[in-house]
Amino acid sequence: MTAFVILHYRAIDTTRSCVRSIRALTGDKHIVIVDNASPDGTGKQLAEEFAASPDVTVLLHGKNDGFARGNNVGVRWVCAHLDADFTVVLNNDVEIPQHDFIPQIARIYAQNPFDLLGPDIVSVFSGIHQSPKTLHGCTLESVRHKRACVARSKNPILLLLSSGEKNSPAIWRLVQIRNRKKQHIDTT
């Protein structure tokens, strides 16, 4: 099963579109919407709307802790309550057009086991790949090593998963965390 964590803040129609695109995917899935303390009541609206949906859980987070912590709320919930093979963290403005997205993740994992998987960002205007390339899969150990190097560095590294092209289908901002052993990376 694949879990999808969506961070929600005020844009209810955008979140609904994201949920619709995930529901259209082939494969077993569960959607976790984390409302980041929307002041307009849209989080409560979503909770009521999906209350009878066994494939959607809405978490009403009491305060807006920002992007990373809000997503961590959802990832921690997945680790505690679901036996997911993969957890996909994405923005609520993302729609996934590939119906075989979930089997694609499983195929990639079977070919090259990974702990984190990011997108291949391709500009829709130029066709240029804007993603950093790596020759080997990313493991938790390599992430820990890089994190330790960054912690010792005087110049921290910031990774942005966006090409800056609004509404680009190539910008699906996927970060996948394997939680088979209930491991997670705390970005707080």
Regions found by a protein language model. Give the residues of each.
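Short beta-strand-to-loop acidic/aromatic patch adjacent to the donor-nucleotide binding site
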Residues: 82-95
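A conserved acidic beta->alpha catalytic loop
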Residues: 35-44, 63, 95
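Acidic helix N-cap motif at the loop->helix transition within catalytic regions
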Residues: 14, 40-49
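Glycine-rich, basic loop-to-helix element that forms the pyrophosphate-binding segment
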Residues: 61-81
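Conserved donor NDP-sugar-binding/catalytic core segment of glycosyltransferases
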Residues: 95-132, 138-141
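Short, acidic, metal-binding catalytic loop of nucleotide-sugar glycosyltransferases
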Residues: 20-29
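Active-site beta-to-alpha loop of glycosyltransferases that engages the nucleotide-sugar donor
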Residues: 6-17, 37
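Short beta-strand/loop segment that forms part of the nucleotide-sugar
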Residues: 28-37, 57-61
